[in-house]
């Protein structure tokens, strides 16, 4: 249920901002379904510039992956729910430690992570990360090209939007940080470091709160 609510909130925001009607399916194997990156035809998307479209594609992809971890921790860890409903965008060390202690309390082997891995679609994470990596590379190239154009511009109106560079770089840094958490979590799972797995996926899920704020800040800045 949390995944569905999470997905509908994300879709509603993108539809309102971009006329965007992609669908996040909670149990969809996005690693094999390449049509996911295209989405259904939409007459409104003609008004969206390529950089905005790439930003929304990448945001939608990463939040689709995070939805499973977000739902798992929301449903199973009361302390995570309390933090997520708080005013804070970053998780403090004490809260993080308390949550991890609870998650790791009964872990004795990799077998104890089987339910977590199934519910969060761990089997398709590698494929999803490959797709996310491609999107991040494309977005980084587009942002670099755009910020270079802004720095060379002489028009005062264009220069007034120079803060786009800072916001875009911050957004990219957050996305790359989340990718790093997910990739390391996968690596820990593959190498049977079962007591380290939750730490990385918790950090990734917690990062969503700040990412949402960054996305709202950057959306429309280049209109």
Swiss-Prot record:
The parts of the chain that form a coiled coil are none
Tell me which GO cellular component terms the UniProt record holds.
Answer: spore wall
Source organism superkingdom = Eukaryota
Q: Where does the motif HBM lie?
A: 207-214
Biological-process GO terms, alphabetical: cell adhesion; sporulation resulting in formation of a cellular spore
Q: Where does this one sit in the cell? A: Spore core; Spore wall; Spore, Perispore
Q: Which UniProt keywords apply?
A: Cell adhesion, Signal, Sporulation
Signal peptide (residue range): 1-16
What does the function comment of this entry state? Spore wall protein involved in the adhesion to host cells surface. Microsporidian spore adherence is an integral part of activation and host cell invasion which requires the extrusion at the spore apex of a very long and coiled structure, the polar tube, through which the sporoplasm is pushed to enter into the potential host cell.
Q: What is known of its domains?
A: Heparin-binding motifs (HBMs) are characterized by an XBBXBX or XBBBXXBX sequence, where X is any neutral amino acid and B is a positively charged basic amino acid, and are defined as the consensus sequence necessary for protein-heparin interactions. The HBM motif is involved in spore adherence to host cells.
Q: What is this protein called?
A: Spore wall protein 26
> Could you read off the lineage of the organism from its UniProt record?
Eukaryota, Fungi, Fungi incertae sedis, Microsporidia, Nosematidae
């Amino acid at each position: 249920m949390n995944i569905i609510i999470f997905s509908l909130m994300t879709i509603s925001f993108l539809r309102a901002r971009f006329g965007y009607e992609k669908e996040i399916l909670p149990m969809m194997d996005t690693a094999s379904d390449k049509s996911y990156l295209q989405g259904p035809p939409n007459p409104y998307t003609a008004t969206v510039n390529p950089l905005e479209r790439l930003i929304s594609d990448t945001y939608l992809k990463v939040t689709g992956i995070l939805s499973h971890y977000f739902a798992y921790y929301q449903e199973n860890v009361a302390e995570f729910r309390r933090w997520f409903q708080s005013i804070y965008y970053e998780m403090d060390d004490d809260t993080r430690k308390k949550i991890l202690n609870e998650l790791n309390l009964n872990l004795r082997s990799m077998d104890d992570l089987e339910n977590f891995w199934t519910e969060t679609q761990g089997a398709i994470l590698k494929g999803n990360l490959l797709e996310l990596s491609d999107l991040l590379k494309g977005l980084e190239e587009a942002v670099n090209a755009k910020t270079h154009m802004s720095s060379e511009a002489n028009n005062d109106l264009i220069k007034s939007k120079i803060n786009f560079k800072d916001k875009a770089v911050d957004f990219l840094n957050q996305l790359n940080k989340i990718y790093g958490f997910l990739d390391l979590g996968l690596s820990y799972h593959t190498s049977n470091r079962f007591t380290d797995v939750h730490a990385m996926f918790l950090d990734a899920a917690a990062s969503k709160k700040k990412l949402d704020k960054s996305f709202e800040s950057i959306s429309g800045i280049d209109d």
